[in-house]
Amino acid sequence: MKTMKTWRIILAMTAAVLSLASCSSDPEYADPEAHEKTVALNEQYAPLMIGTWHYEKTGDTQRYFEELTFRADGTLTGTRKWQVRKLVTIGGEQQYTDWEDLDPLVGAFTGEWKLSYWSPEGQDGQKRNVLQLTASYDDGEYMAYSTNVDFGYADATTLRIQGLYVRDADGWINFERGEAEPSF
């Protein structure tokens, strides 16, 4: 009986101590620096990201067009048109084949976007500004994006991100603000 009474006292005291312990409703971040820089990144650039952007690049064997629409709620819609052709030799003469869509990497897609400051490679990677993109083609079979690309900047006319599928000579893509249709 005495043991039971002792346990009740210990349990009551533990409950009293726990009820008096202060709990903070403020979250504690595993990486406060990354959190602060993510907040600052979003305050500076997220409002500028909202809207529609387009990019087109045409070469001898490849032509690529992409349009992205970023919404304030973190959703993303887009469309991609990508065509390729080959340089072949026929009868001793070089000529290009007809343009062909690069299936399944063409069509409309929907998904989500987010700006963050972190290292996509994990603990050993260098932290940097990234644009996280996750999107599936509307037919649901393939991903249009499931990646983190380096984010350069956004302003009134330009969105600069690291090239993923196609890129300019410097490794970046400069999207232009506004809706457009592919020239091909």
Question: Which sequence ranges carry the predicted segments?
Answer:
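N-terminal helix-cap/turn-to-beta initiation motif at the start of protein domains
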Residues: 32-54, 69
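Structural signal for glycine-centered tight turns and loop->strand junctions in beta-sheet-rich domains
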Residues: 72-76
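Short, low-complexity, Pro/Ser/Thr/Gly-rich segments in the mature regions of secreted, periplasmic
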Residues: 170-184
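Contiguous, well-ordered beta-strand patches that form the walls/edges
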Residues: 58-63, 81-160, 167
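Bacterial signal peptide processing site
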Residues: 24-27
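C-terminal motif of bacterial Sec signal peptides marking the signal peptidase cleavage site
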Residues: 19-22
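Bacterial N-terminal signal peptides that target proteins for export
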Residues: 2-11
